[in-house]
Amino acid sequence: MKAEIHPNYHSITVVMTDGTEYVTRSTWGNEGDKLNLDIDSKSHPAWTGGQQQMLDRGGRVSRFQKKFSGFLKKD
């Protein structure tokens, strides 16, 4: 196997939307970094039955809704 071609694999802390934390290993960030999730299995509509609203980060959702608002409307 070639040396120095694999990314650094280290421990990070993942912070869920409800504040719970767990330690896992990842190539993301640096050793000991915290990854704060905006959405997870406890808050994603696919796992909660679609009752929660989507977060509009940077206006992306509202731009999408504006662009495609009349897409499926029948005249």
Swiss-Prot record:
Asked if the keyword Ribonucleoprotein belongs to this entry, the reply reads: yes
Q: Which InterPro entries match?
A: Ribosomal_bL28/bL31-like_sf, Ribosomal_bL31, Ribosomal_bL31_A, Ribosomal_bL31_sf
Q: Any coiled-coil ranges, and where?
A: none
Q: Which GO terms describe its cellular component?
A: ribonucleoprotein complex; ribosome
- An annotated GO BP: translation
Superkingdom field: Bacteria
| Keywords per UniProt | Ribonucleoprotein, Ribosomal protein, RNA-binding, rRNA-binding
Pfam name, any one: Ribosomal_L31
The Gene Ontology terms for molecular function here are: rRNA binding; structural constituent of ribosome
Task: Give the matching PROSITE patterns.
Answer: RIBOSOMAL_L31
Q: What does this protein do?
A: Binds the 23S rRNA.
- Family (UniProt): Belongs to the bacterial ribosomal protein bL31 family. Type A subfamily.
Q: How does it assemble?
A: Part of the 50S ribosomal subunit.
Q: Which PANTHER family does the UniProt record give?
A: 50S RIBOSOMAL PROTEIN L31, CHLOROPLASTIC, LARGE RIBOSOMAL SUBUNIT PROTEIN BL31A
Q: From the Swiss-Prot or TrEMBL record, give the protein name.
A: Large ribosomal subunit protein bL31
Q: Which gene encodes it?
A: rpmE
